[in-house]
Amino acid sequence: MSVKPETETGTAQTAAAEAPEEGVYSFAAMEAKWPQVWEDLKVFTPADDGSRERRYVLDMFPYPSGDLHMGHAEAFAMGDVVARYLRQKGFDVLHPIGWDSFGLPAENAAIKRNAHPSEWTYANIDTQAASFKRYAISADWSRRLHTSDPEYYRWTQWLFKRFYERGLAYRKDSPVNWCPKDLTVLANEQVVNGACERCGTPVTKKSLNQWYFKITDYADRLLEDMDQLQGHWPERVLAMQRNWIGRSEGAHVRFVIEATADRAEREVTVFTTRPDTLYGATFFVVAADAHLALDLVTPEQHDELMAYREKVKALSEIERQSTEREKTGVFTGRYAINPLNGEKLPVWAADYVLADYGTGAIMAVPAHDQRDLDFAKTFGLPVRAVLDTGDEDPAETGVATAGEGTLKNSGELDGLSKSEGIPAAIEILEKLGTGEKFVNFRLRDWLLSRQRFWGTPIPIIHCGECGEVPVPDDQLPVRLPDDLRGEALSPKGTSPLAAAVEWVNVECPNCGRAAQRDTDTMDTFVDSSWYFLRFVSPDYTEGPFDPEKINNWMPVGQYVGGVEHAILHLLYARFFTKVIKDIGLIEANEPFSALLNQGQVLNGGKAMSKSLGNGVDLGEQLDKFGVDAVRLTMVFASPPEDDVDWADVSPSGSAKFLARAWRLGQDVSSEPGVDPATGDRALRTVTHKTIADAAELLDNNKFNVVVARLMELVNATRKTIDSGAGAADPAVREAVEAVAVILSLFAPYTAEDLWNTLGHPASVANAGWPKHDDALLVQDTVTAVVQVQGKVRDRLEVSPDITEDALRELALASENVQRALDGRGIRTVIVRAPKLVNIVPA
């Protein structure tokens, strides 16, 4: 059952329509009553007038693939706690919502349904929007946006043009990751274990002319600026990004490729982290699928190379780099000259070297690199050890040696250690003019072309006379055509937009001659790399965002979303932010000051999936237990970064607690505004300690512990009402009002109703965080539990400083204890002052 707002025929609305009995907790009645009140009061719309300090809280916006699921329920409950807490603390909070609404699933659905992707997309958005409203997310709905709206992607195209003008968007021919099922290109980050991240099909290589963003120009800054995020982002996310960027210090070494009868001499540069091992190079390898291989191969070897390249196309990157696979390759007929010793090295083309990493060529040192050694063994190439590590000769063992050691067989480098040999080798290369120190990165430029329809069109026109011509700003957005739908969108290996002849054929903006639009669309990660900026002023028409407002809100103070976005979205968003800053449009250097990764929602220890049949329908859970009970369960079940196993939690238990908390309001008999100072001291101490503890815990995202403290306060308040000072005590009102405010972060419907019952106008969301009194945090007494033979027989209020002897005396004097002993003697008394006395009868 899907998550739906209450309707006239819905179960929840029907229950709400029947007025609940007085004093009966009805989540359905509350869910029917309060949403319209919140909307009318614009409770969650920030003033944005500078009257209060601003805070920006953002959840990673969803993709509209059907209705909300359990993962959405957890993630958005977490983000909402942060937004509601900051609002209670007096900040002007921006907490917007929108949809990442371009993408392949919509296109596939349109093909299946003979429809336009927008129909499926916006229908799902409407469904999810209604569900979010039922789920009581404290979002400012006036800022809602969708990346597939022309009003949004106009500015995505505008930003692309600014990148293009700075040389950060460019086209090149290169082997790219190709999904043979979706018939589209994939970025490196979208290939997981050699397969398409989306559909799981093994990825192949294909040579295409594609658009790229030059993210490598920002590699150093992306790496260095992580220092600003240390302690505010999860360490594992920072580690994943550092590894993906992959900074390596080493050297560029230039090898001369000898001329042949029909090939001129040329120079090829390689990057190596171990220039000290140059004397161990016994052959040279270029990526078989690189243009360099075609440039180098002799006519005699050409056909063999071409046949080999066809085989390489069918291999994934993971397969090509595997150490388990037998090495393959083709001799090019050429030789490279080692710049240090003049030795001729045969040049091979092989699949284990990648065209788009480094320069696409390597010097092979088989004694000290396992893949080089495996290749040498396969093709009978020499193996020369130049590093004495104390291990056996790799030529004999078949196991390469690496790491520390003393250089040998290395001319003037003999006897040097690794730390001495690397700078010495670089110095020699620099003197010879054949190399220099260089920093390389694993990170490669961001491939953004996609051969699909439902994405942002690339705002470039191709003219036979003028070449690439950006679409003028006043002609943006380049809108997607409306007349392509259904089967016309099916993947054919070229962009579906090519079939929209009237759309494609245009005049060149420069010369007026016949020209064609670019028919690729942008990777949808482009859309999500700047959406957080648009939320600041989503209706602004003079630019991507209002320059008068953007620096008031950015950077995002708290970003919430899954760790699966650690490399793709988060790295791209950081890149975009830095470029936009360099353009001079914003001051922020990083998009997200703090990051919270919520765990997964599992069922029976496994991720929910249709194939396993272990999915849990969120709508059914909401109908059965209520929104507040589900939200509270999500938050209380574990620390936010840990997984929640729905099989092990109890939304029914949460519902019972909420009913207990709500009933406190029915019992309070004092008037609003009564002075709590005259109230029960013990309850006031619990209340003020809860307020103080909750604030500190919330500041550290320990939401589950806050709920535990809240439960203790509810129990203490009930005890005071039933067996202590009574419902009229001012301390009871103070406690219940604190319960309502703290509860509003987790269970907004129940909290609002409780606040209303206490005589306050809506909304509790703006009540303000209660102030604690430090004097009340010092406990005058503590409760000592007295047990007789392991059973609790009495509780004594005693000084925190009571001695063991004094506590023993009080316990033995207790009438309840004497009654339990029933005249028996005492074998022993165990005292743990000030909390416990255990009496063991004789």
UniProtKB/Swiss-Prot annotation:
Subcellular location: Cytoplasm
Binding positions (ATP): 610
Matches recorded under CDD domains: Anticodon_Ia_Leu_BEm, LeuRS_core
Entry's Gene Ontology cellular component terms: cytosol
Reactions accelerated catalytically: tRNA(Leu) + L-leucine + ATP = L-leucyl-tRNA(Leu) + AMP + diphosphate
Single Gene Ontology BP annotation: leucyl-tRNA aminoacylation
Sequence motif: 'HIGH' region, positions: 62-72
Residues covered by region (Disordered): 390-414
Pfam families on file: Anticodon_1, tRNA-synt_1, tRNA-synt_1_2, tRNA-synt_1g
GO molecular function: aminoacyl-tRNA deacylase activity; ATP binding; leucine-tRNA ligase activity
Gene3D superfamilies: 3.10.20.590, HUPs, Isoleucyl-tRNA Synthetase, Domain 1, Valyl/Leucyl/Isoleucyl-tRNA synthetase, editing domain
Sequence motif 'KMSKS' region, residues: 607-611
Enzyme class: ligase
Keywords tagged on the record: Aminoacyl-tRNA synthetase, ATP-binding, Cytoplasm, Ligase, Nucleotide-binding, Protein biosynthesis
EC number of the protein: 6.1.1.4
HAMAP family: Leu_tRNA_synth_B
Family: Belongs to the class-I aminoacyl-tRNA synthetase family.
Protein name listed in UniProt: Leucine--tRNA ligase
Annotated organism of origin: Paenarthrobacter aurescens (strain TC1)
Lineage summary: Bacteria, Bacillati, Actinomycetota, Actinomycetes, Micrococcales
